[in-house]
């Protein structure tokens, strides 16, 4: 179990040897035997990953990043499961590409957040600086360009990507500074975030409260305070069963 006070740590990676075709990256024949690093941030943990090209990636809780030990000459490809904030070193001759399920994001140098948890219904990409192109992994259609302050939402069920200007785009990376921000978030969304953030399990004992929504901002280092805030907003009651287990009704 990880402590509830998060400290950024430079990640130690597990080195994986990936041989053959069919891997998530689009590899040419001379890339087939690349050695890959897999970095995992468990629930209740955040990591800072330093990439071979000098780029930096902040990995949120319950997330995994896979990347080559050394990038290929003309591309820099990584895969993401979960959430991460990317600060990419500029190199126009070697584009940087993030693959997150059925979404691909291409950049040459910029800062952006990607939220791509497998259990979520959507994948969200929010751009802070520079510009990026976003599209479907296996689509031949032209990729869509994003500008700072925009968020792209990929709906998994419809397989559609929609880009919009987001007045709250700074919220996307608030987790880096250990802040929890919820805007019209359902109870399920809030509990899912808390479970990842604090490495706990919360069981809903009364389905009637599932329709409750929440709007609040707070520091992410005190679970009890967060639960008190939720209880002040809606008529819910949290009960601690064990150190890492709670119920709500």
Segments predicted by a language model, with ranges:
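A residue-level detector for the "anchor" residue at the start of short, highly conserved motifs
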Residues: 3-249
């Amino acid at each position: 179990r990880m402590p509830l006070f998060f400290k950024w740590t430079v990640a130690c990676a597990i080195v994986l040897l990936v041989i053959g075709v069919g891997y998530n990256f689009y590899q040419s024949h001379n890339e087939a035997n690349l050695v890959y690093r897999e970095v995992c941030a468990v629930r209740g943990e955040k990591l800072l990953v330093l990439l071979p090209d000098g780029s930096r990636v902040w990995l949120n809780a319950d997330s995994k990043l896979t990347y080559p030990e050394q990038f290929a000459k003309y591309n820099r490809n990584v895969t993401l499961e979960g959430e991460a904030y990317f600060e990419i070193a500029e190199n126009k001759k070697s584009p940087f590409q993030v693959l997150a399920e059925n979404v691909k994001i291409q950049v040459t140098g910029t800062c952006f957040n990607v939220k791509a948890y497998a259990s979520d219904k959507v994948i969200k990409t929010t751009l802070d600086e520079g510009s990026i192109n976003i599209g479907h992994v296996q689509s031949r259609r032209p990729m869509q360009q994003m500008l700072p302050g925009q968020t792209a939402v990929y709906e998994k069920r419809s397989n559609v990507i929609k880009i919009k200007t987001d007045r709250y785009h700074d919220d996307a990376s608030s987790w880096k500074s250990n802040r929890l921000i919820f805007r019209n978030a359902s109870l399920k969304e809030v509990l899912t975030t808390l479970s990842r953030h604090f490495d706990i399990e919360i069981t809903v004992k009364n389905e009637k409260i599932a329709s409750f929504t929440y709007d609040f901002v707070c520091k992410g280092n005190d679970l009890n305070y967060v639960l008190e805030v939720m209880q002040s907003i809606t008529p819910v009651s949290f009960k601690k069963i064990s150190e890492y287990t709670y119920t709500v009704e």
